């Protein structure tokens, strides 16, 4: 990758730290999936998470809004703070946490209802007051979808193309005004044109939201992110954070040889 391909502004954020992760370990039953993860994730910027398959990238972001707890026999040690609050404190309201931290998955998952009802679903659940028509338009505009669907918001969301469905899922997350948007390989099921639109959308949102994206696409990580985390597994196949820092540094002057080998395609 050339320096010209790093389209995202590499200036560190001035918005502070969104997540502080300290000594985090993650277990599925007795199997340890992640070990000794400590990292700060900056607010109002895009952080990319890269690494070979099976190194715990998706597991890590699922821990950031506690969605991993939906799986059986999961245990998380250590501490994860979101803007200074320990999200695993027993007093934390998980429903409210997930309003603050939206999630977009690999494959588009619109609800089997109208476009309008997809957008208003979250605001209704959380008891938002106000003009729902306005929420729908604002959310769809934020997701760069309004002009394509404004005349058919009362039709089924399942009739949209794959790329449109994924942008609808992003709009649905934005409708509840989250602080953070987690994206787990959001373009893996999309064609190149739809992928480009998602990347352009991420760029427009990065100054408003904290965005954390898992991707196997090195070029995509370079284009959209200001910060990058590289995960790998140790000899016991336990995921670990090898290196993190500004994307430009990770791609062009990594400190760890494993990072350099992965970026250059020598393994992974």
UniProtKB/Swiss-Prot annotation:
Give any GO molecular function from the UniProt entry.
ATP binding
As its record notes, the protein acts as a catalyst of:
phosphate(out) + ATP + H2O = ADP + 2 phosphate(in) + H(+)
> From the record, what ranges are coiled-coil?
none
Q: Keywords for this entry? A: ATP-binding, Cell inner membrane, Cell membrane, Membrane, Nucleotide-binding, Phosphate transport, Translocase, Transport
Give an example GO cellular component term for this record: plasma membrane
Judging by the UniProt lineage, the source's domain of life is Bacteria
Say yes or no: keyword Chloroplast present.
Answer: no
GO terms under biological process: phosphate ion transmembrane transport
The positions annotated for binding ATP are 51-58
SUPFAM superfamilies in the cross-refs: P-loop containing nucleoside triphosphate hydrolases (SSF52540)
Q: Name one Pfam family in it.
A: ABC_tran
Known EC number: 7.3.2.1
Which protein are we looking at?
Answer: Phosphate import ATP-binding protein PstB 2
């Amino acid at each position: 990758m050339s320096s010209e391909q790093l389209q995202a502004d590499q200036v560190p954020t001035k918005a502070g730290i969104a997540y502080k992760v300290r000594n985090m370990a993650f277990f599925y039953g007795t199997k340890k999936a992640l070990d000794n993860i400590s990292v700060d994730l900056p607010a109002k910027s895009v952080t990319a998470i890269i690494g070979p398959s099976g190194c715990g990238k998706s597991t890590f972001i699922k821990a950031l809004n506690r969605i991993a707890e939906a799986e059986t026999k999961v245990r998380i040690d250590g501490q994860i703070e979101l803007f200074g609050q320990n999200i695993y404190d027993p007093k934390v309201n998980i429903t409210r946490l997930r309003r603050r931290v939206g999630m977009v998955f690999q494959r588009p998952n619109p609800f089997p209802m109208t476009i309008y009802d997809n957008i208003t679903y979250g605001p209704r659940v959380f008891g938002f007051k106000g003009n729902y028509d306005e929420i729908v338009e604002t959310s769809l505009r934020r997701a760069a979808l309004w002009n394509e669907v404004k005349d058919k918001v009362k039709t089924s969301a399942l009739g949209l193309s794959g790329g449109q469905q994924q942008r609808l899922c992003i709009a649905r997350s934005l409708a509840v005004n989250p602080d953070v948007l987690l994206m787990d390989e959001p373009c893996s099921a999309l064609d190149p044109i739809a992928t480009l639109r998602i990347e352009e959308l991420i760029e427009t949102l990065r100054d408003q939201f904290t965005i954390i994206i898992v991707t196997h696409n090195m070029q995509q990580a370079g284009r959209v992110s200001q910060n990058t985390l590289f995960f790998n597994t140790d000899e016991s196949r336990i995921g670990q954070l090898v290196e993190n820092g500004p994307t430009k540094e990770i791609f062009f002057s990594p400190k760890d040889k494993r990072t350099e080998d992965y970026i250059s395609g020598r393994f992974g």
